């Protein structure tokens, strides 16, 4: 059996789709999988069992689909985890016996993980028993990484791909890092030009205070990003793809929310995560930039609040 899967575009969505992917894998144990999608989503599932990875060419996706029609020949099942119209066209170009399309308007108030699971349950008329986040990577170490100086590791993730509205201030991240710098090594994570600027700003603030810090922005693959996050002792993050990676590995995480719905994108089943947010009338606006121009949902959320939540988390963690 040959199964074609159009993966979600964003890293966080791809992580949240992982239980649904493994439900398909469990139901069709001997199937061959073609995983198609963005650079980051395909990299996340590069080691998925019995799979062929194809990176989507956004500039000429339909021409690419026509080529894939010849290359892949007949496909038994196709699943689109994207609700975009382009995804529907691609699946109709391919020689597919049965096609299933994710509808983002169904189960609108449910967590994104459950939305994806319901999509597969309804498509295949089955009941999903696998609901844990899961990635196919085999990590190099079996126990938390301890550095030579004996310090634990604090990871900072100041970026968020959706837009600037989701990003806590770089100086706030730096203040949190300064508070834990005596007990923790500091690692900064990020990707892309916009996040590079944020990461560099945090790095410079900490270096000026003679704090030892490593800036890993744009210096990791998806696999090494997962590995580095997995062995953090504490992770401070915006609502983002790396936040969902930390949930896979049950990392102690303080997740900072502003314009997005934490009921739908919170760290899934991570009992070692705590959410920090305000309760403003304008929240959640679900906008890429603040429509009111003040960005109070993030600016009024001060570093001391996050520091206190992190301390409580370290005291009361399930790990």
Where do the protein language model's features map onto the residues?
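Catalytic machinery of carbohydrate-active enzymes
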Residues: 1-319
């Amino acid at each position: 059996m040959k199964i074609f899967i159009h993966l979600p575009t964003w890293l966080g969505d791809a992580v949240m789709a992982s239980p649904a992917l493994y439900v398909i894998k469990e139901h069709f144990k001997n199937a061959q999988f073609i995983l198609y999608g963005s650079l980051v989503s395909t990299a996340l599932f590069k080691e998925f069992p019995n799979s062929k990875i194809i990176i989507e060419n956004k500039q000429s996706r339909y021409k690419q689909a026509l080529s894939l029609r010849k290359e892949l020949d007949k496909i038994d099942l196709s699943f689109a985890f994207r609700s975009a119209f382009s995804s529907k066209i691609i699946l109709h170009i391919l020689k597919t016996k049965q096609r299933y399309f994710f509808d983002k308007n169904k189960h609108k108030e449910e967590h994104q993980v459950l939305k994806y699971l319901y999509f597969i349950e309804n498509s295949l008329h089955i009941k999903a028993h696998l609901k844990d986040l899961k990635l196919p990577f085999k990590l190099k170490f079996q126990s938390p990484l301890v550095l030579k100086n004996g310090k634990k590791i604090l990871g900072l993730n100041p970026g968020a791909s959706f837009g600037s509205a989701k990003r806590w201030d770089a100086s706030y991240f730096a203040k949190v890092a300064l508070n834990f710098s005596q007990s923790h090594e500091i690692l900064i994570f990020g990707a892309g030009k916009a996040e590079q600027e944020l990461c560099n700003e945090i790095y410079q603030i900490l270096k000026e205070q003679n704090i030892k810090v490593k800036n890993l922005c744009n210096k990791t693959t998806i696999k090494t990003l997962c590995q580095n996050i997995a062995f953090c002792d504490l992770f401070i993050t915006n609502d983002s793809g790396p936040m969902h990676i930390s949930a896979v590995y049950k990392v102690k995480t303080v997740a900072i929310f502003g314009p997005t719905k934490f009921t739908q994108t919170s760290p899934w089943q991570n009992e070692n995560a705590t959410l920090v947010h305000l309760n403003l009338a304008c929240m959640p606006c679900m906008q890429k930039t603040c429509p009111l121009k003040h960005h109070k949902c993030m600016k009024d959320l001060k570093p001391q609040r996050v520091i206190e939540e992190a301390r409580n988390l370290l005291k009361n963690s399930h790990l």
